[in-house]
UniProtKB/Swiss-Prot annotation:
InterPro entries attached to this UniProt entry: PSI_Ycf4_assembly
Source species of the chain: Huperzia lucidula
Domain of life according to the entry: Eukaryota
Role according to the record: Seems to be required for the assembly of the photosystem I complex.
Compartments, as annotated in UniProt: Plastid, Chloroplast thylakoid membrane
NCBIfam families on file: PRK02542.1
Biological processes, Gene Ontology terms: photosynthesis
Sequence intervals crossing the membrane: 22-42, 64-84
Family of the protein in this entry: Belongs to the Ycf4 family.
Mode of membrane association: Multi-pass membrane protein
Keywords: Chloroplast, Membrane, Photosynthesis, Plastid, Thylakoid, Transmembrane, Transmembrane helix
Subcellular location, principal: plastid
Name of the protein in question: Photosystem I assembly protein Ycf4
Length: 184
């Protein structure tokens, strides 16, 4: 949902709070917990969960491996839950004609550089470029060409926009910034 006036344009950017990340975090958490809850009862010699009988699992070597997989699986699930909690990668793009400034703001991981804000002068913007690579998983990214620097991506690779939507977004932004548009 973009907001635009005559002098200002704001584009919110979605971060880690996506349905796919929630699904992967749940799957890895449940899988890791399942391995761990099967490995521990094999050490204790008792069934902690009646649905998961562990009497047939010998602690050495199967129980140890199950516990190890359970503990190892908790690390990526913890990482996913933290990125969802902190909403890493979210932010906004501000295009301010009155000030002549473009600000790209993103939230990062907690610490000294949690807030990431990159500023450009509108005078340095040369063009808006659409990168399209059609394959099994197509890649469509909107870039901003900045004088004397690398191209700056404005959309995420995981943003699934159709080619038409991407071109419309690029044309709208190029019109607002009064720059040319390069594309496929």
């Amino acid at each position: 949902m973009n907001w635009q006036s005559e002098w200002l344009r704001v584009e919110p950017i979605m971060g880690s709070r996506r349905i796919s990340n929630f699904c992967w975090a749940c799957i890895t958490s449940l899988g890791a917990l399942g391995f761990f809850l099967v490995g521990i009862p094999s050490y204790l010699g008792k069934d902690l969960i009646p649905v998961l009988p562990s009497q047939q699992i010998v602690f050495v070597p199967q129980g140890i491996v199950m516990c190890f997989y359970g503990i190892a699986g908790l690390f990526p699930s913890f990482y996913l839950w933290c990125t969802i909690l902190w909403n890493v990668g979210s932010g906004y793009n501000i295009f301010d004609k009155r000030e002549g400034i473009i600000c790209l703001f993103r939230w990062g991981f907690p610490g000294e550089n949690r807030r990431i804000c990159i500023r450009f002068s509108m005078k340095d913007i040369q063009a808006i470029r659409v990168e399209v690579r059609e394959a099994i998983s197509p890649r469509r990214v909107l870039h901003m060409k900045v004088k004397g620097q690398q191209d700056v991506p404005l959309t995420r690779i995981s943003e699934n926009l159709t080619l038409r939507e991407m071109e419309e977004k690029a044309a709208e932004l190029a019109r607002f910034l009064h720059v040319s548009m390069e594309g496929p």
